[in-house]
Structures are given as C-alpha cells and as structure tokens.
A protein has these predicted regions:
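N-acyltransferase acceptor-side catalytic subdomain
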Residues: 1-134
Length: 134
C-alpha cells in the first residue's frame, strides 16, 4: 500500500472520504473541504492541508489521516506558545509541526480512519507515512 498526499479534502470523491469518516461531522469531507476551499483553513492562515490517503492493491481507499502542517499556533485551541521558545532554547525547531486535528475546532474523535473490518496494519502504515513527512 502506497500513501498519497492530498492538498485538499476535495481531492478525494466525497463517497470515498465519507466511507471512512462515517458520521463525524468535523472530519467530513464537506466540513474540511469547505474550510480549505474558502481559505479559512489554508496556507495563508497557517493550515496547510497534507492529508494522507492509503489505497489497497485494488486501488480502493483503505485508510485516511487528515493532517495539517502548522507554522504557528494562531487559531489553535491549545496554546503551546511557551513550548515553542523552550524547544528552540533546547536547540530544536518547534515549527513546522504536523497535526491531525480539525481547524479551529476542539472536537474529539478518530483521526486514523480505516474502513470497517480493515487490515490492522493500516493505522500503522498511516503513522509511518506521517513520520516520513516530518
């Protein structure tokens, strides 16, 4: 299975995305796609979409991990502004950071998305692909 990087939730057919997102309105293609297409969650505001899609050998969407590359914490509900300078004092870069969250929304819910009865290796493959991005 090879991961594919998506610049927008709208890069996948809605039926494919929704099959994995189920009934969670905040990770729905409609919600994320609208935020991305209107610029509310776009690069100019520090929310660069980098969603990972994983297809099986037959080309069917098997896993999905909504991700955003963040250059700052403006618009986040968790303020980590004290962490960034501390991390930099330790000689490391805190930004950019890759987050699997919903822009401007502190909603709980699954983020490693796989179809019902999916192979247990799919979440691990998504995590490995995300680690490769950073």
């Amino acid at each position: 299975m090879q991961p594919t990087l998506l610049d927008c939730a709208c890069d996948l057919p809605e039926s494919d995305w929704q099959r994995l997102a189920a009934n969670d309105p905040f990770i729905s293609r409609a919600f994320l796609g609208a935020a991305e297409q209107t610029g509310a969650a776009g690069e100019a505001l520090g929310w660069r979409a980098m969603h990972l899609a994983l297809r099986d050998d037959a080309g069917r969407l098997a896993g999905l991990l909504p991700l955003y590359l963040r250059e700052h914490s403006f618009g986040d509900f968790s303020r980590d502004w004290n962490w960034a300078p501390a991390w930099q004092q330790a000689g490391r870069d805190y930004y950019p950071k890759l987050v699997s969250g919903v822009p401007y929304t502190p909603s709980p819910g699954p983020r490693l998305l796989a179809g019902e009865g999916a192979d247990a290796a799919i979440p691990a493959a998504l995590i490995a692909a995300a680690i490769e991005l950073v």
